[in-house]
């Protein structure tokens, strides 16, 4: 039976490069990763595949899963629910596959309450000036929105203490390599492997 995979929770401010670093990790790593598929109540768009792009559910089905405690984390955005289904994550982990969960800080804090032994990694910019330059460089937000994102980033960085690791994204390949090193080390953490080695030890004789 394969060892259980790691749940890797990956967060950071908007514009820090989470998606870019995550893609670099997937493309350059020899490890088997599964990018977590989210669940949503929004309408399925042309070309989207249920179970690949999202798990598409009705609002009633989603809310029932919430009541049953079957969502690792969830939020409502523009009238639709988005979240991470617990059953899907557990089934993947049980196959010995590491699950990569790229979510916002508030969602990560929800996950920490339910899966405290997950690996929590916070991706940081070198500094706030660099983060602002990246947001401006995307060319998708107004100056007002960028200012709001910077203020939000300050709040999120203040919550970094809730994470296990902080990785600076100064260069994408370097940041990806640092994350891979963290994941590799976590696979050898004593708390994760001790059960296997305890099985090798002789059992104490029963006291009469």
UniProtKB/Swiss-Prot annotation:
Enzyme superclass (EC): transferase
Localization terms from the record: Cytoplasm
Gene3D superfamilies per the UniProt record, alphabetical: Guanylate Kinase phosphate binding domain, P-loop containing nucleotide triphosphate hydrolases
Any one Gene Ontology molecular-function term assigned to this protein's record: guanylate kinase activity
EC number, as in UniProt: 2.7.4.8
Domain of life: Bacteria
Binding site for ATP: 12-19
Keywords: ATP-binding, Cytoplasm, Kinase, Nucleotide-binding, Transferase
Domain Guanylate kinase-like residue range list: 5-184
One Gene Ontology cellular component annotation held by this UniProt entry: cytosol
Swiss-Prot/TrEMBL catalytic activity: GMP + ATP = GDP + ADP
Major localisation: cytoplasm
Stored PANTHER family: GUANYLATE KINASE, GUANYLATE KINASE-RELATED
Family according to the record: Belongs to the guanylate kinase family.
Biological role stated in the UniProt entry: Essential for recycling GMP and indirectly, cGMP.
Protein name according to UniProt: Guanylate kinase
Species, as recorded: Streptococcus pneumoniae serotype 4 (strain ATCC BAA-334 / TIGR4)
């Amino acid at each position: 039976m394969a060892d259980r995979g790691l749940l890797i929770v990956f967060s950071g401010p908007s514009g820090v490069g989470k998606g870019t670093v995550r893609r670099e990790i997937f493309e350059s790593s020899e490890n088997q990763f599964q990018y977590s598929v989210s669940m949503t109540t929004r309408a399925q768009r042309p070309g989207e595949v249920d179970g690949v792009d999202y798990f598409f559910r009705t609002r009633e089905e989603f809310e029932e899963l919430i009541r049953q405690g079957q969502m690792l984390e969830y939020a409502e955005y523009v009238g639709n629910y988005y979240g991470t289904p617990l059953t899907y994550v557990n089934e993947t982990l049980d196959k010995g596959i590491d699950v990569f969960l790229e979510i916002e800080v508030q969602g990560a804090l929800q996950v920490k309450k339910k899966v405290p032994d997950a690996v929590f990694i916070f991706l940081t910019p070198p500094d706030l000036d660099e983060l602002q330059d990246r947001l401006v460089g995307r060319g998708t937000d107004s100056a007002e929105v960028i200012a709001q994102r910077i203020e939000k980033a300050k709040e999120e960085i203040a919550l970094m203490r809730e994470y296990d690791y902080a990785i600076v994204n100064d260069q994408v390949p370097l940041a990806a390599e640092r994350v891979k090193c963290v994941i590799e080390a976590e696979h050898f953490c004593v708390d994760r492997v001790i059960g296997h080695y305890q099985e090798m030890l002789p059992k104490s004789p029963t006291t009469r």
